[in-house]
Design a protein with these regions (language model features):
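Interfacial segments of alpha-helical transmembrane regions
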Residues: 49-78, 140
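N-terminal transmembrane-helix/juxtamembrane module of multi-pass inner/ER membrane proteins
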Residues: 1-44, 78-108, 225-229
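Hydrophobic alpha-helical transmembrane segments
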Residues: 34-51, 65, 119-124, 142
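Hydrophobic transmembrane alpha-helices of multi-pass, membrane-embedded glycosylation machinery
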Residues: 46-53, 148, 170
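Alpha-helical transmembrane spans of integral membrane proteins, capturing the lipid-embedded, hydrophobic core
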Residues: 37, 41, 67-72, 76, ...
Length: 230
């Protein structure tokens, strides 16, 4: 078993160093802003608006509470339980032997331990839970793209191995699935409204447009800051 773990860890490190090696100043700015949690407040707010316009306010409130609970469970599982237990140093940590080979942006190195990734766990948890709510919507494609790019940004910034992100995504999926179906069981009068509206949500393109606009702003801001910094 030890040999298998060491072999997987070696592959994880090699894949990380390969992916982390593609960088320049422009993308340093882009990935730093993309991974910043407050960047996506307009997207979250627009998604909430879609929920309000399609469902009764009690249903929307219950959904928001369920999403918050699922993210809290994810975050605590990753940060409070597993990271101190596993104690796998981030690749960017100066005590990690590979740190001289790691590209970091603006000297950001994160905390000491990185397994599993809280960013990946939380973003995939939110994405999967939202997918359960909106079902068969074009919004699901953007949610998957958003969570995937959020995960990749952590490799780019040098603070997580791919394995950290994979396990984080699995935790996010399991947590979102369990909380959603528990929510369905105890709030059936609310969740019965989801299936009839599957794929037919009004204003579902709003979050997509706001998300794309946010990315365009990040792209433009990254270009400006790159030029100013030269």
């Amino acid at each position: 078993m030890k040999e298998i773990i060491e072999y997987l860890s070696q592959i994880d490190t090699e894949v990380f160093l390969f992916l982390n090696g593609f960088h320049n100043t422009y993308w340093d700015y882009f990935m730093t802003m993309f991974t910043y949690r407050f960047t996506w407040v307009p997207f979250y707010a627009t998604f909430l608006y879609v929920m309000i316009r399609n469902f009764h306010y009690k249903v929307t409130t219950a959904c928001v509470v369920a999403i918050v609970v699922s993210i809290l469970i994810c975050d605590q599982t990753a940060s409070t339980l597993l990271k101190p237990m596993v104690e796998r140093m981030r690749p960017s940590n100066l005590d990690n032997p590979i740190s001289p080979l790691v590209h970091v942006a603006f000297d950001y190195r994160g905390g000491r331990y990185g397994f599993p990734s809280s960013h990946a766990a939380n973003s995939w948890c939110m994405a999967f839970f939202a997918m359960y709510l909106v079902r068969r919507s074009r919004l699901n494609i953007f949610l998957a793209f958003w969570a995937l790019t959020m995960s990749y940004s952590r490799i780019y910034l040098g603070v997580h191995y791919p394995g950290d992100l994979l396990v984080g995504a699995i935790i996010g999926f399991i947590t979102a699935t369990v909380v959603y179906y528990v929510f369905r069981y105890f709030a059936k009068e609310y969740t019965d409204q989801f299936e009839p509206k599957a794929g037919k949500l009004k204003y579902q393109h709003y979050p997509i447009l706001v998300g794309i606009a946010s990315i365009i702003v990040i792209l433009a801001a990254s270009g400006i800051m790159t030029l100013v910094g030269q």
